[in-house]
């Protein structure tokens, strides 16, 4: 039976609950325990799949096709444990499930209420898989006091009450602000946050204090006294240069020991943190630097491409090189020469995205990389842009484009070399889609197998002829243009097992030019960099040595 750790936040949002949860999971793993991490989000969207990246950041996709919060990416990167659909839930999903049950008559005519029906649905979610691991770490989104979060706080209060004593603990993350006028760290916001938490029946066992300044011993003692928490369980959470320092930093502060003490686990197994020491060594002792241009649409918010930024960092670790990723808005050169914007970069990456805005700039970026022999990695839409560029400028399909950008019914602006995907094979059955389907959850989602051409660059990078990668798309390159494009040098080196869906394209007569329909960044880890990103950065290093 799993022990449960509930991670909550107070004072302000975006303090780093997800990273704290991931770091704690990594520390418990380092002591020999098995873990699983979960995220409970109070928003009413069923999932983040239809939310704007500017609202929510990136959507992290699991192997089994769930569209989830980006925090699940942190969980996977820090622990190596693949997330599942059952590791993410929102108020929207909970209420949807409850209302479906009501319509079916499952509640036998009873009046449906937040308590007990909604809270019971949340508790049922928490119980899934509780026999599989030693620790279940559950992060509650938002902050204590948010009205939309109240059913979740009530549910975890009940859940802990239902479990045997010592089976559940609560970790609360708050802000310790520094007031420059008085030269002091202020503890009052933390005291009020804990007071709010206790008012709904939850007493924190461990406090994490986010601070940009060293926390004096007297302030820790004060917080311990007023918040009724052991002094040893008042843990500093300082600002760090890199998120990958978090496991070592939290261990130095005693977080993992405080959690084990709260559970009464003694003596605790000693941690083996060698791989995190190696990660930090590779980051801090990089032997060079490469500049990578990320030509995208959502460049104002780095969280929109969070996994890509982290995967590039991992690729740098694999090559003991610092990767300086620079975000460039593709709209800047939709109608002009991209050279002034892209000169001086050692590699170019065009990530996934939706909609027509900025696509001509991405196509120009792919052309620049192809003609200037600059390493190019196109992901999802980035692969489609590379194919459209090759179709226009090499295969002489001058009006090549995507069905995604032909908005007017009956009026075609482009010859669609990229089309709306209407059916594909998933497991042993065929999935069918129509243009007028709902937007949410209707894409080709999750892990799919691809067959690689023996002797191709990608087969050499993967050291395999069959791979499995995660997808999130509803448009696909039209395989009918394969012969024309391959005749111009753009090879289709990865295909779906049935040979119908192009998964990877590459240019042989180029230092490094690869487009992939899937999202390799979602499977990269600091201690296991994704092979595509590792080799992409290696190619950038080669270019940097020629400059």
From Swiss-Prot:
EC code: 6.3.4.2
Protein name: CTP synthase
Family: Belongs to the CTP synthase family.
Keywords: ATP-binding, Glutamine amidotransferase, Ligase, Magnesium, Metal-binding, Nucleotide-binding, Pyrimidine biosynthesis
Free-text activity regulation comment from the record: Allosterically activated by GTP, when glutamine is the substrate; GTP has no effect on the reaction when ammonia is the substrate. The allosteric effector GTP functions by stabilizing the protein conformation that binds the tetrahedral intermediate(s) formed during glutamine hydrolysis. Inhibited by the product CTP, via allosteric rather than competitive inhibition.
Binding site for CTP: 13, 146-148, 186-191, 222
Gene Ontology molecular function: ATP binding; CTP synthase activity; glutaminase activity; identical protein binding; metal ion binding
Entry binding sites for L-glutamine: 353, 381-384, 404, 474
């Amino acid at each position: 039976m799993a022990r449960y750790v509930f991670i909550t936040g107070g004072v302000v949002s975006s303090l780093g609950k997800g990273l704290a949860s991931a770091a704690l999971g990594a520390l418990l793993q380092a002591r020999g325990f098995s873990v699983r991490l979960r995220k409970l989000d109070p928003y009413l969207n069923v999932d983040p799949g239809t939310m704007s990246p500017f609202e929510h950041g990136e959507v992290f996709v699991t192997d089994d096709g769930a569209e989830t919060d980006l925090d699940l990416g942190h969980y996977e990167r820090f622990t190596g444990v693949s997330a599942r659909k059952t590791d993410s839930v929102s108020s929207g999903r909970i209420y949807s499930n409850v209302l479906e049950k009501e319509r079916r008559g499952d509640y036998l005519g009873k009046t449906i209420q937040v308590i007990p029906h909604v809270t019971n649905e949340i508790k049922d979610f928490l119980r899934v898989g509780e026999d599989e691991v030693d620790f279940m770490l559950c992060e509650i989104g938002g902050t204590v006091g948010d009205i939309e979060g109240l059913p979740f706080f009530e549910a975890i209060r009940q859940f802990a009450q239902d479990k045997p004593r010592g089976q559940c603990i609560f970790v609360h993350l708050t802000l310790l602000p520094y007031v420059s006028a008085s030269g002091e760290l202020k503890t009052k916001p933390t005291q009020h946050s804990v007071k709010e938490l206790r008012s709904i029946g939850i007493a924190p066992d461990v406090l994490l204090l986010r601070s940009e300044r060293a926390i004096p011993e007297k302030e820790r003692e004060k917080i311990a006294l007023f918040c009724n928490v052991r002094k040893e369980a008042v843990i500093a959470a300082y600002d760090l240069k890199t998120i990958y320092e978090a496991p070592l930093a939290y261990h130095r502060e005693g977080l993992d020991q405080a959690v084990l003490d709260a559970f009464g686990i003694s003596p605790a197994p000693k941690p083996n943190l060698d791989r995190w020491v190696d990660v930090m060594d590779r980051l801090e002792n990089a032997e060079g630097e490469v500049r990578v241009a990320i030509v995208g649409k959502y460049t104002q918010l780095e969280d929109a491409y969070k996994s890509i930024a982290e995967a590039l960092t991992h690729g740098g670790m694999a090559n003991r090189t610092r990767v300086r990723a620079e975000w460039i808005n593709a709209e800047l050169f939709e109608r002009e020469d991209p050279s002034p914007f892209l000169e001086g970069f050692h590699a170019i990456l065009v990530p996934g995205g939706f909609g027509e805005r900025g696509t001509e700039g991405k196509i120009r970026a792919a052309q620049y990389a192809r003609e200037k022999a600059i390493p190019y990695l196109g992901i999802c839409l980035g692969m489609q842009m590379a194919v459209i560029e090759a179709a226009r400028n090499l295969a002489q399909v001058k009006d090549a484009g995507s069905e995604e950008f032909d908005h007017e019914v009956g009026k075609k602006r482009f010859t669609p070399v990229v089309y709306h995907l209407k059916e594909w094979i998933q497991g042993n059955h065929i999935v069918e889609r129509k243009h007028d389907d709902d937007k949410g959850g209707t894409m080709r989602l999750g892990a799919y197998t691809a067959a690689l051409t023996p002797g191709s660059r990608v087969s050499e990078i993967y050291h395999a002829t069959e791979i499995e990668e995660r997808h999130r798309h509803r448009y696909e390159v039209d395989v009918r243009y394969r012969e024309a494009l391959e005749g111009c040098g753009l090879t289709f080196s990865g295909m779906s097992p049935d040979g119908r869906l192009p998964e990877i394209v590459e240019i042989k007569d180029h230092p490094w030019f690869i487009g992939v329909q899937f999202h390799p960044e979602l499977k990269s880890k600091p201690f296991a960099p994704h092979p595509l990103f590792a080799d992409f950065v290696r190619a950038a290093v080669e270019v940097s040595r020629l400059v």
